[in-house]
Amino acid sequence: MREKIRLVSSAKTGHFYTTTKNKREMPNKMEIKKFDPVVRKHVMYKEAKIK
């Protein structure tokens, strides 16, 4: 089952992306490098729960 997650910027800008992930195939927390438009750089985004 795919679960909705939020990817929060590690640059502490408050920017986030939403996506889905398959919990069975990827049980660990997701970390991915994406573009943060607030600081105009690629930074690490870490998984957080959607409230």
UniProtKB/Swiss-Prot annotation:
One of its GO terms (molecular function) is structural constituent of ribosome. GO terms for biological process: translation. PROSITE patterns: RIBOSOMAL_L33. Keywords: Ribonucleoprotein, Ribosomal protein. Disulfide bonds: none annotated. InterPro entries: Ribosomal_bL33, Ribosomal_bL33_CS, Ribosomal_bL33_sf, Ribosomal_zn-bd. One of its GO terms (cellular component) is cytosolic large ribosomal subunit. It comes from the Bacteria. Belongs to the bacterial ribosomal protein bL33 family. HAMAP family: Ribosomal_bL33. This is Large ribosomal subunit protein bL33. The gene is rpmG.
